[in-house]
Amino acid sequence: DGFRVDVIWHLIKDESFSDNPPNPEWHEGIDPYRAIVPLHTTDRPEVHQIIASMRRVVDSYSERVLIGEIYLSIERLVQYYRVNLSAVHLPFNFQLLLAQWDARHIARLIVEYEKALPEGGWANWVLGNHDRSRIASRVGRAQARVAAMLLLTLRGTPTLYYGDEIGMQDVPIPTER
């Protein structure tokens, strides 16, 4: 039991509500969210105080977990474990979800993540979620089976998006639904 907090790294904005600067690399055809550099609205230092207070509440109950959805580089992601592990128990590790599907690249990501984990930090791996195309749509059904085997044999907690275990692929959803 516990809580998964969506976009936990977005909880704090800078106090003057400054506009984010335009992304000079953005152009038509790229996700509109990427049109700005979220300098003032994500990964703010103050967010760690909020998360620490959430962690204290969760830790006041036995056997509970606090999970944070955090799309950041490994270097920034591991900061969400914090000193003395005072933040989320599991800052979702989306490296496999975002990686190009190449064995050497994935092997480097695994090693980099494991090396970056703070002492006592528990590894976790995510292959799919509601924000991205399903693994079978991204790499094909045969490779999705390989991906599931990788996910379930890596050290740490695996997160399997419902339907990925049967090779479910993306399908269009009619607007009337």
Regions found by a protein language model. Give the residues of each.
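Active-site and adjacent substrate-binding regions of carbohydrate-active enzymes
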Residues: D1-R177
